[in-house]
């Protein structure tokens, strides 16, 4: 269901290409290639869909409550006008915190900087894209990226 929904959303050449290549690698159980394609797509979609106060923010600021401040304010306004309290609870108590936490883990090095030489025990874009990962990427990690893409499209894609 998630993949079909993403195929319907991704109609531009670059989004189709990255999703197609990512899914081909996924079917071939090449999870490292899958993660590379899907993380590039995730970065692209977040930057296109989210109203960041400043597109040139560091990842640490961008993928925080401060970075999502404009988007959250607009969602709060729209949900108040159109949907009600349950939708606000789902968005602000569940979806936003989970999405921001996942994006932080994927895009921000935190304690696991290259110079420390300790690889994170989870998928991190910098370690992967800079050729520093020394472990296999698991299938479930690629499914997590697909889930994040689906959540982003659900939350921000129809604006």
Residue ranges of predicted features:
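Amphipathic, oligomerization/interface secondary-structure segments
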Residues: 32-159
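Charged alpha-helical initiation segments
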Residues: 1-32
């Amino acid at each position: 269901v998630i993949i079909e929904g993403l195929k319907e959303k991704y109609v531009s050449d670059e989004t189709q290409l990255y999703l197609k290549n990512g899914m081909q690698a996924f079917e071939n159980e090449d999870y490292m290639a899958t993660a590379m394609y899907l993380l590039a797509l995730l970065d692209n979609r977040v930057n296109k869909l989210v109203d960041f106060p400043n597109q040139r923010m560091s990842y640490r600021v961008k993928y925080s409550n401060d970075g999502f401040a404009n988007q959250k304010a607009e969602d709060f306004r729209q949900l108040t006008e159109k949907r009600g309290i349950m939708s606000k609870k789902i968005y602000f108590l569940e979806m936003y915190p989970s999405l921001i936490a996942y994006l932080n883990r994927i895009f921000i090095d935190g304690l696991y900087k290259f110079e420390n030489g300790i690889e994170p025990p989870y998928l991190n874009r910098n370690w992967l894209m800079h050729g520093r990962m020394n472990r296999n990427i698991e299938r479930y990690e690629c499914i997590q990226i697909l889930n994040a893409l689906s959540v982003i499209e659900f939350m921000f894609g129809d604006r």
